[in-house]
Regions:
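Canonical Radical SAM [4Fe-4S] cluster-binding loop centered on the CxxxCxxC motif
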Residues: 1-17
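Conserved, mostly hydrophobic/aromatic
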Residues: 21, 133, 207, 269
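Conserved SAM/AdoMet-binding glycine-rich loop
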Residues: 23-175, 179-183
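Radical SAM enzyme [4Fe-4S]-AdoMet core and its adjacent flexible, acidic
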Residues: 52-55, 61-81, 144-146, 150-152, ...
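Catalytic cores of alpha/beta
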Residues: 117-118, 182-199
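A generic structural motif
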Residues: 175, 204-212, 276-279
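Radical SAM enzyme core and accessory elements
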Residues: 215-331
Length: 331
């Protein structure tokens, strides 16, 4: 609902022929600066190369319906045979060392293909260390407004991706695209996403804040405050500071965001997530924060009396959090 590619290029998928791709790939091998690496074969969504179903060719695209969200259509045909054939043929050309897929792929479409040949060869031959995918959020309510599949699809894809990666003894990761402040996303939803990222050891280096673009359903929600499909009211964070709070939660681990994260948690009274416990999102940023909030707790008062020597000092003890994934990269 938020992507404007369909307005730029149309909803109907058009593809180059295998012959055209092979001719261009062969030409590359004769260029003096070519090193043997083709960095991408695929469109905006690499694994879309055919009509969604037989009905689409006969009757055209469905109005007001989506092929994959909120659930895959029963008429959807998920097949990667042609795309896989092209990739295999290009790999076999003399002078070609590697063929990567750097365009994003629709993992929800990939999961609908009962033949796992493409999935396995994708992992084995076409990932240059990390693969881009776009779960965008974890909240079902927000994903429904986005027109994206629920997070269970991403979890299943991730599980199989790392399973296949382990079977070939490779070190490869996922780079998830994430979005803050999409219409329908509340501060509670942003906190749920932060907790999901923490639980799954995901530390995104870049996140996208929702920006309204002309013509999209999401922009309609943003400006009207209504879901055009249901006419129900939709909350949108529009104040720059409110948007900053949601964005900071997606990178809760970044020191420059600590103050914003603490403010967001206090705003909706999630004091349980402020502290030194491993399940917390941020350590207290306000001096004597814990003592002030726990002043009625007799056990804490006793501990304070027993720690006279440390009076005036904040105890931020605890295990250092691991930065999971390859250095300077994340999954």
């Amino acid at each position: 609902n938020f992507c404007s590619i369909a307005f730029h290029q149309g909803r109907y998928i058009t593809t180059r022929s295998k012959k055209s791709i092979m001719i261009e790939a062969e030409k590359l091998t004769h260029m003096p600066n070519f090193k043997g690496y083709i960095h991408d074969i695929g469109g905006p969504t690499a694994n879309f190369r055919q009509p969604s179903c037989m009905l689409q060719e006969e009757h055209g695209l469905c109005k007001g319906k989506k092929c994959l969200a909120p659930k895959p259509c029963k008429n959807l045909v998920a097949n990667h045979e042609e795309y896989l054939d092209i990739l295999r043929s290009v790999r076999q050309l003399p002078g070609i060392k590697k063929v990567f897929i750097r365009s994003g792929i629709r993992y929800d479409y990939l999961l609908q293909d009962k033949d796992d040949s493409f999935f396995r060869e994708l992992v084995k031959y076409h990932v240059s260390g990390q693969l881009k995918v776009a779960p965008e959020h974890c909240s079902a309510a927000v994903l429904d407004k986005m027109g994206k599949p629920h997070i269970e699809a991403y979890i299943e894809f991730s599980k199989r991706y790392f399973q296949y990666t382990g079977e070939i003894d490779k070190e490869q990761y996922l780079v998830p695209y994430l979005m803050s402040s999409h219409p329908g996303s509340t501060l509670n939803d942003a906190i749920d996403l932060a907790l999901f990222l923490k639980k799954n050891h995901i530390r995104p280096e870049q996140v996208q804040d929702f920006y309204p673009t002309p013509g999209t359903i999401s922009t309609t929600m943003f400006y009207t405050g209504l879901d055009p499909y249901t006419m129900e009211e939709v909350y949108s964070a529009k104040n720059p500071h409110d948007k900053a709070l949601q964005r900071a939660l997606l990178q809760y681990y970044n020191p420059k965001n600590f103050a914003l994260v603490e403010e967001a948690l206090k705003k909706i009274k999630r004091f349980d997530l402020i502290g030194t416990d491993p399940n917390c999102l941020v350590r207290p940023q306000t001096p004597n924060y814990q003592n002030r909030n726990n002043s009625g707790n007799s056990r804490n008062n006793k501990n304070n009396r027993n720690n006279k020597n440390s009076r005036g000092k904040q105890n931020f003890g605890g295990k250092k959090q691991n930065n999971y994934g390859r250095k300077k990269k994340n999954r």
